[in-house]
């Protein structure tokens, strides 16, 4: 056999479908993180495993590691704390409010692209340093939890009192395919901006491969005023206000240093591109020893304080204590030092006790005193160190726990007793739950209320479908659909919503007078279930819709209007709601929303078919309602969509609305959106639609619709499941 002929006959490295058809709809994002990639098995319960963990012992091991400097990657100042703070920060700091994706909740820093981002240089070493501890405690602590816990212990080991720590983050085992990190194909490019400096949604970082902002200033321009603009935008997009922003920057930069000892061109490829013998490590430097005092990461060479391994107010003391002038690091990066040679000898060297340095600052540090609003906060923190410490503790806790969902998911002995508004609190259940007879009585009340099937189903869907599996916000629990801002969202049809809620509140009030109680949150879901039950009965099928009470009603005071505003759908294919034309197609937005709802392609398909025949469009239009008998739970949507007697033609310039006409007579039959027609156009979705359009599929369709509906109604019922 010729040496040049590969004996393996497989598809690896070949041309993919997406190479041929780049605009092909991606459905793979609906089928991530299954048991096929997870070595733990379906029966593994991480919450139970974590409960058996001796957290104090783990912390003791981490504490010992802080000063156990390893020759293969020596600790700056003899302490790994600053490196571990950066590791935790950069794990949590990818979170963005726009779609709730990113963050520390899945341990995704272990995988591409994050493990190889330019901003994460040397964090591969940080994770290797804590591997012996992960190895020791095994599956009792996830990588995701360990990374954040290590950052907490790092702070505590350097004299800072943290607010607490919650476990419960479940590891993923493959890179996330659903997260849009930007359209750029080069590191540190910034095609994400348009206009004056409008950052593309939902992105929260200024350049590809950065966590937040460029520390040298926008695109490397050392302008502190312009840097402040970027800082405010990016931190706001990950849920931080000005006070929290200043505290996080100053608190983080109280410790450690940056690394720019030499020419960055001497640093080798990132982990994903490194040679196999480096075993997953990257950025191998050929500058001198490549480590310790010779390390190169960001290219900046900055130590902020005279006590870089101890909590202090020295960051602000130095920031306000000197006038600053621009200089360059040995690697050629823009940074700042005191004017007129001030500050000589006040900063220790990280590896040589005989050397001393001047303080240095980043352009983004100076933004904290150049920007008037940031300056007021910085000066207050400078003059009131205790207040600074308190705000930093709360902001750090928020940073590292923001994507974990409600505090009912938090695990461990260090969970703070205090509930915070950003956790979207919901009152605990304070009454016995309704029993089977109560549910039967309430169903009869709903049936006799005069509300239509489409009204109650649409309201329940609107309530539950706000859920995002990315950060576990939203959902039916809390009944926030009756509160600002959700009650006023156009997609929720405010007039119809107010009508439905008024009727349901009347039923609730009457029932609660009996001495028993049901929350409006439960009643909204129950009403939707009643609607589906009636629709199935209309179609001649008797069904039982699962309903599990236990939801409670949040108050307006427990609901941050600005925070919840980001949950408003810009489009919702499930309700044929597309008020604005985007560069992204309506079908892509549908798949994105389905992914946030943790739906599979079959679940998405059957829900679309069911919601259409139940007549739940947001604008009450008949677009996509491909049935002559609305409010009958039938497979008519699929039957009529795949009917070869119908031809379709666009009726709008944007080709987002279509008319279906009789192939022979030319008479109009239906109207549809791109979301509707994709189930006949896309080969994978058409295959699913064919299953439900078959003559023997009616019962399967109803069963599958009810299962998918129940899943969505219970997505935020963390009390019913533990990962």
From Swiss-Prot:
One GO CC annotation: cytosol
Required co-factors: heme b
Residue location of crosslink Tryptophyl-tyrosyl-methioninium (Trp-Tyr) (with M-238): 89-212
GO biological process terms on file: cellular response to hydrogen peroxide; hydrogen peroxide catabolic process
GO function terms (MF aspect): catalase activity; heme binding; metal ion binding
PTM comment text: Formation of the three residue Trp-Tyr-Met cross-link is important for the catalase, but not the peroxidase activity of the enzyme.
Active site: 90 (proton acceptor)
Record's cofactor remark: Binds 1 heme b (iron(II)-protoporphyrin IX) group per dimer.
CDD domains reported for this sequence: catalase_peroxidase_1 (cd00649), catalase_peroxidase_2 (cd08200)
This protein's record includes keyword Transcription: no
Binding site for heme b: 253
Keywords on record: Heme, Hydrogen peroxide, Iron, Metal-binding, Oxidoreductase, Peroxidase
Enzyme Commission code(s) on record: 1.11.1.21
Family per record: Belongs to the peroxidase family. Peroxidase/catalase subfamily.
PANTHER family per record: CATALASE-PEROXIDASE (PTHR30555:SF0), HYDROPEROXIDASE I, BIFUNCTIONAL CATALASE-PEROXIDASE (PTHR30555)
SUBUNIT field: Homodimer or homotetramer.
Protein name, per record: Catalase-peroxidase
Organismal lineage: Bacteria, Pseudomonadati, Pseudomonadota, Gammaproteobacteria, Alteromonadales
Name of the encoding gene: katG
